[in-house]
């Protein structure tokens, strides 16, 4: 790993709890500063912040979540979220696609894996909770890829659709670039068929 990547990963670890506390604060405060913990994007996908253990019952029973796409690194979910085994015990499959917080970009392969995972649950009439720490960047990138595939939208159209529902998403330029690559691959496959 290059020195800059080590620094970025280290910075993400140092800032994890302070930024998580900020996310919790924004979820609990009233008025214009309030941010909902998660939002339903369509009949299959919910986009949100860390699915805390206390939310499990609501996600499974009220939202019909049977799949969880975790864009976090393992250390981010170690103490506050269900383990893969705990998810399995309540009938939920977890797919972990580890991506560094703040500076990370999901790989093209992971975007494809995540979209196929969501489509599997879509075909079963069940829901998928896609998350990172705050539900703003890494997970929003994954949800944009899902919308690109499902609706044949451009990356910009997908991001705009998400932002209309969850206005505080933040797709960085490097994440937009990977979405453009994803879109190009999806369009090329569609042209072959």
Curated annotation (Swiss-Prot):
Pathway given in the UniProt record: Phospholipid metabolism; phosphatidylglycerol biosynthesis; phosphatidylglycerol from CDP-diacylglycerol: step 2/2
GO MF, one example: phosphatidylinositol-4,5-bisphosphate 5-phosphatase activity
Domain of life: Eukaryota
Record PTM N6-succinyllysine, positions in chain: 85
Family: Belongs to the protein-tyrosine phosphatase family. Non-receptor class dual specificity subfamily.
Function (record text): Lipid phosphatase which dephosphorylates phosphatidylglycerophosphate (PGP) to phosphatidylglycerol (PG). PGP is an essential intermediate in the biosynthetic pathway of cardiolipin, a mitochondrial-specific phospholipid regulating the membrane integrity and activities of the organelle. Has also been shown to display phosphatase activity toward phosphoprotein substrates, specifically mediates dephosphorylation of mitochondrial proteins, thereby playing an essential role in ATP production.
Protein name as annotated: Phosphatidylglycerophosphatase and protein-tyrosine phosphatase 1
The organism's taxonomic lineage, starting at the top: Eukaryota, Metazoa, Chordata, Craniata, Vertebrata
GN (gene name): Ptpmt1
């Amino acid at each position: 790993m290059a020195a800059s990547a080590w620094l970025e990963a280290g910075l993400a670890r140092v800032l994890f709890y302070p930024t998580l506390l900020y996310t919790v604060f924004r979820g609990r405060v009233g008025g214009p500063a309030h941010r909902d913990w998660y939002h339903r994007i369509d009949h299959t996908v919910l986009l949100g912040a860390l699915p805390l253990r206390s939310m499990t019952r609501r996600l499974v029973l009220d939202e019909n979540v049977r799949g969880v796409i975790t864009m976090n690194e393992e250390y981010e979910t170690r103490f506050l979220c269900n383990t893969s085994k705990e998810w399995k015990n309540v009938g939920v499959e977890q797919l972990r696609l580890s991506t560094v917080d703040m500076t990370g970009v999901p790989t093209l392969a992971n975007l494809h894996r995540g979209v196929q995972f969501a489509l599997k649950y879509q075909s079963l009439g069940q829901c998928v909770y896609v998350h990172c720490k705050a539900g703003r960047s890494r997970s929003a990138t994954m949800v944009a890829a899902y919308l690109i595939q499902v609706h044949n939208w451009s990356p910009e159209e997908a991001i705009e659709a998400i932002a209309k529902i969850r206005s505080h998403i933040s797709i960085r330029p490097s994440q937009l670039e990977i979405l453009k690559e994803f879109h190009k691959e999806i369009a090329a496959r569609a042209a072959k068929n």
